[in-house]
Regions:
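Gram-negative bacterial Sec-dependent N-terminal signal peptides
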Residues: 1-11
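A generic "folded-domain core" signal
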Residues: 11-24, 33-215
Length: 215
């Protein structure tokens, strides 16, 4: 990637530092497809259509964002309890969602999922973030956990690490009644609070579907 970094620095000197930092973020992606997608979004040339191109980009809706928001459309009433859906099969899918407390619809959505045998903790945002990754503080009742999350799907999705580190992060939330995701951003996505009461019990089918170690 050194050759690419040089090309970027040569063609866009004012943004070279920010671009290189963003590329370092892409390199931290463990999954090859996610890493490729990160580079693709970072290095894609600007659309010559100007404002129209910006509108197209702003209108991009990602798969995980859609999964979270579509599940929340099935919620009855103004409730916040964890909503669980399961799709059986060789590679079962489990999705658990809850909307942000204190927000009017459309509300941000916290989602735990097992899709393609990968455990994910994500937040679907209604106001996009213009960064590639971000430091977050997870306040689970009185416990504060510091972490580093990725920003995906054109800024509309926050995602924790995957694999064992991501699973460990989820386990640290067990027993808490609420989770506040604090990104420090100066907008509506800055602090989001969710009802996670009963998470350890509700997540049982996800643990089975994604074959958590020791389950």
């Amino acid at each position: 990637m050194a050759g690419v970094a040089v090309a970027v620095a040569t063609t866009t000197p004012p943004d070279a530092t920010a671009t290189l930092q963003a590329m370092q973020s892409c390199r931290r992606e463990s999954a090859a497809l996610e890493r490729l997608d990160c580079y693709d979004h970072l290095l894609a040339p600007l659309s010559p259509s100007g404002f129209d191109g910006a509108l197209v980009k702003a209108g991009f809706v990602g798969e995980a964002w859609t999964r979270a928001t579509e599940q929340e459309k099935r919620r009855e009433g103004n409730t916040t309890e964890l909503l669980v859906t399961q799709v059986p099969g060789e590679r079962p899918t489990v999705v658990i969602t809850t909307p942000a407390i204190g927000h009017v619809p459309p509300r941000p959505v916290l989602m735990f999922s097992c899709v393609d045998n990968i455990t994910r903790m994500q937040v679907a945002l209604m106001h996009p973030l213009d960064v590639h990754d971000i430091a977050v503080t997870l306040n689970a009742d009185s416990r504060a956990l510091r972490s580093h999350w990725f920003v995906r799907e054109n800024g509309t999705l926050l995602e924790s690490s995957r694999g064992l580190s991501g699973i460990d992060e989820i386990k640290q939330l067990f027993g808490a009644k609420t989770l506040t995701v604090d990104t420090g951003a100066d907008n509506a996505a800055g602090k989001l609070t969710f009802n996670i009461d009963g998470l350890a019990r509700a997540i049982a089918p996800l643990r089975d579907a994604c074959h958590w170690a020791g389950e």
